Amino acid sequence: MSIFNLTDEKMKETSSTFTAHEIYQQPATWRKTCAQLAACKDELQAFIDQVVKQDDFDIVLVGAGTSEFVGNSLFQALNPKYNYKVKSYASTDIVPSPENFLSRTKPTLLVNFGRSGNSPESLGNVEAAEVVCQNLYHLFVTCNHEGTLSKMAASRKNCFAINLTPETHDQSFAMTSSYSNMYLATYLALNLDLSLIHISEPTRLL
């Protein structure tokens, strides 16, 4: 199979097999992500509304490494819609000093990005926030349905997990389809009122 005019032999020789495949597969995975969001939109909207229907609230996007970049990219697009209540922080900053970033009393939607859903900083971020925040909801966006974040969502009422399809759990050093799908899923999740037509017909979105 040839991808970007690279043969299997060339990709093996240059150790680029995973990276090339994961870049190439992105349009197909985006359509699957759109379909996923369309399938759970009512349940997801009800969960998010517990926060955003309040008079005042915070939406806090958190991740480490490339997962932090997802939040840094998203908050600029989301802020106008949510009256500039969206923030983006590194989970590695929140873990040691959550009180410097999170409100103790304000309703807070903590959106946690984690490719594996198992990293110490992702899990530590959840527990640190629980200690500080009195009115906290977690939205986990992960590429691993078997990860700890996903399992946590199944057992806690204040958690919701968007488990992206297995092929988005990139194996290459560079996060490509995992990054773009976590971005897309979160953008759609926080724009369900504007996206209903498009996510029910994903070819129009893409």
Model-inferred region functions:
Residues S15, T19-E22, Q26-T29, C40-E43, ...:
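General structural feature for long, well-ordered alpha-helical segments within catalytic domains
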Residues Y24-Q25, K32, P80, Y187, ...:
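Generic detector of well-ordered secondary structure
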Residues I197-L206:
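Single conserved hydrophobic/aromatic residue that forms the stacking wall/gate
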Residues A35-A39, K87-Y89, S116-G117, R204:
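Short, flexible loop segments at the rims of nucleotide/cofactor-binding pockets, characterized by
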Residues K53-I197:
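Glycine-rich phosphate-binding loops that contact phosphosugars or nucleotide phosphates
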Residues F4-Q54:
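An N-terminal, well-structured beta->alpha segment
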